[in-house]
């Protein structure tokens, strides 16, 4: 019987090797190592942060993002309008530590009333190929609780390349900053449609007349989905003479939603992982890839589209992540002594243990260490 248990254990240990990643480096870093994907939706900053240059491709733009964000460089990357996303990984899997926030992701919120919320997705490299092509789960936020009936799950949007970059001129009134009103057409899977408008380059000194559609994308359409659409958070509190836009922060759970100095509000717990559409909770032990996307589809006067920005991310418990990876590679799962364990436990001599204390045990062919 014991030989059978150990054989099952050995097989399980082999399978778990591919699911945890730890690069061969002298010293592990808690910061981003590589940006795997950068696919922004159209927006006023997408060809500027990072800067597009003739000849750039999806790969070179992702590399530019890496140079701006890796190793805590604190550069600024814009994700454009709704759905635009960035995917990154560290030099190791991030462990899900029970009862604690696991990752901090920073935006560029300048103050209250300027929230541009982004949703976080997480994935585990289950097939072991080092690519972000496995199942993705969402980290739910406060809108699941306080905006019931206002959130759209399974939302999809398609942007169409503009037919012209020719400015139509100032339109007057509350839209006096708009130079192309019907600029970039969007359609969604809810029967909705509309246009991103273009604002005057004079509004921002960094503008250089670039298109809002990503210039390295060769397709004439960009589709993002199936994702979650948060309700609008932007309101014009001014009048017809002067706009004053406020974009209210959500309670918790979103990137670029609170100021970076608020560490707790910029920290996120893998225990909040859910399936995107059904919202079924998912237990995630390790995360290899993280994705952030702009979660609202709105335009706010002279501010134009709401676009999530990213300035960095870090593992909030580096040492624990590394130790748990080592345990997993050895076929050992760490659990707390107070954790309820369903099923029978055996010690390494094959004896059934009714009241386990701290130590190493076997359950269903897998090793557990109780700390």
Predicted regions and their residues:
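C-terminal tail/sorting-segment detector
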Residues: 360-371
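Bacterial Sec-dependent N-terminal signal peptides
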Residues: 1-20, 332
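A domain-level signal for the mature, folded cores of soluble proteins
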Residues: 20-116, 140-328
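Predominantly extracellular/luminal cell-surface or secreted proteins
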Residues: 121-125
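Residue-level detector of functionally pivotal "anchor" positions at catalytic/ligand-binding pockets or at interdomain
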Residues: 322-349
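Exposed beta-strand and adjacent loop surfaces of beta-rich binding modules
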Residues: 117-119, 342
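Acidic, glycine-anchored loop motifs typical of Ca2+
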Residues: 126-135, 151
């Amino acid at each position: 019987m014991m030989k059978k248990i150990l054989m099952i254990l050995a097989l399980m240990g082999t399978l778990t090797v591919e699911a945890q990643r730890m690069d061969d480096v002298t010293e592990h870093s808690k910061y981003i190592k590589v940006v795997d994907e950068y696919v922004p939706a159209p927006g006023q900053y997408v060809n500027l942060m990072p800067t597009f240059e003739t000849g750039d491709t999806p790969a070179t733009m992702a590399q530019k993002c890496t140079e701006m964000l890796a190793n805590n460089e604190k550069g600024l990357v814009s994700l454009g309008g709704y759905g635009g996303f960035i995917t990154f990984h560290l030099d190791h899997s991030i462990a899900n530590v029970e009862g604690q926030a696991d990752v901090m992701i920073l935006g560029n919120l300048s103050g209250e009333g300027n929230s541009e919320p982004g949703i976080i997705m997480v994935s585990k490299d289950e097939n072991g190929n080092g690519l972000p092509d496995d199942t993705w789960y969402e980290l739910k936020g406060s809108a699941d609780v306080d905006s019931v009936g206002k959130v759209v799950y399974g939302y999809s949007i398609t942007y169409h390349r503009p037919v012209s970059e020719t400015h139509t001129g100032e339109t007057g009134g509350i839209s006096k900053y708009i130079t192309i009103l019907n600029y970039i057409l969007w359609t969604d899977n809810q029967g909705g449609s509309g246009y991103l408008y273009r604002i005057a380059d004079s509004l921002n000194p960094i503008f250089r007349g670039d298109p809002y559609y990503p210039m390295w994308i060769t397709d004439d359409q960009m589709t993002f989905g199936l994702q979650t659409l948060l309700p609008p958070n932007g309101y014009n509190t001014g009048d017809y003479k002067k706009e004053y836009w406020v974009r209210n922060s959500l309670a918790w759970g979103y990137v670029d939603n609170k100021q970076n100095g608020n560490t707790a509000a910029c920290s996120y717990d893998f225990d909040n992982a859910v399936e995107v559409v059904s919202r079924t909770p998912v237990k995630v032990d390790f995360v290899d890839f993280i994705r952030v996307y702009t979660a609202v589809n709105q335009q706010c006067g002279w501010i134009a589209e709401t676009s999530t920005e990213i300035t960095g991310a870090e593992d909030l418990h580096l040492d624990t992540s590394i130790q748990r990876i080592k345990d997993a590679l050895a076929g050992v799962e760490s659990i707390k002594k107070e954790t309820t364990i369903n099923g029978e436990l055996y010690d390494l001599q094959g004896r059934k243990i009714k009241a386990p204390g701290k130590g190493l045990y076997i359950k269903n062919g897998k090793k557990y260490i109780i700390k």
